[in-house]
From Swiss-Prot:
Locations listed in the record: Cytoplasm
Alphabetic keyword roster: Cytoplasm, Protein biosynthesis
Major subcellular location class: cytoplasm
Species of provenance: Nitrosospira multiformis (strain ATCC 25196 / NCIMB 11849 / C 71)
Listed name of the protein: Ribosome-recycling factor
InterPro entries, sorted: Ribosome_recyc_fac, Ribosome_recyc_fac_dom, RRF_sf
């Protein structure tokens, strides 16, 4: 029973960590990366579709993303979708390609993005602590129902605390890396 609770808590913590990685990946830095356009959708035959489902996305250089639509008629729609996204990008069409240059970040924008990163990190830490709280509550319920002994409950709580500490350390590493990436000029 205790092993199941720990396994469940670890799976939930892993999902929270993956969600944080996705959220941090959407925050634009000065460098181009293809994952930046993953959440941008375009209208494709009446259905909102991710750009990477209707075009090849690649890097031309460190500061430029190129988008090559599989259908020429999608050029305008994809360019418009990128321009209207909340990324602050200004794509241009060159022949059958869409070039998306990464504008350099201003110092003020870097600070704002750093605040966003810290906020996302704190939300992930809170999620980890909530998972810990739920697991500990489940252990207490088992103790009340006399399905486990006090020693087993205490050991389970210690294990869950170690798990929580490990995942929070992982969050801190992710945040430090993202902040360093943002502040690099």
């Amino acid at each position: 029973m205790i092993a199941e609770i720990k396994k469940s808590a670890e799976q939930k913590m892993q999902k929270s960590l993956e969600a944080l990685k996705l959220d941090l990946g959407k925050i634009r830095t000065g460098r181009a990366h293809t994952g930046l356009l993953d959440h941008v959708t375009v209208d494709y035959y009446g259905n909102p579709t991710a750009i990477n489902q209707v075009a090849n996305i690649s890097l031309a250089d460190a500061r430029t993303i190129t988008v090559a639509p599989w259908e020429k008629k999608m050029l305008g729609a994809i360019e418009k979708a990128i321009r209207n996204s909340d990324l602050g990008l200004n794509p241009t069409t060159v022949g059958e390609l869409i070039r998306v240059p990464m504008p350099p970040l201003t110092e003020e924008r870097r600070r704002d993005l750093t605040k966003v990163v810290k906020h996302e990190g704190e939300a992930a830490r809170v999620a980890m602590r909530n998972i810990r709280r739920d697991a500990n509550a489940h252990l207490k319920d088992l103790l009340k129902e006399k399905k486990i002994a006090e020693d087993e409950e205490r050991k389970g709580q210690e294990d869950i605390q170690k798990l929580t500490d490990r995942y929070i350390a992982d969050i801190d590493k992710l945040l430090q890396a993202k902040e360093a990436e943002l502040m690099a000029v």
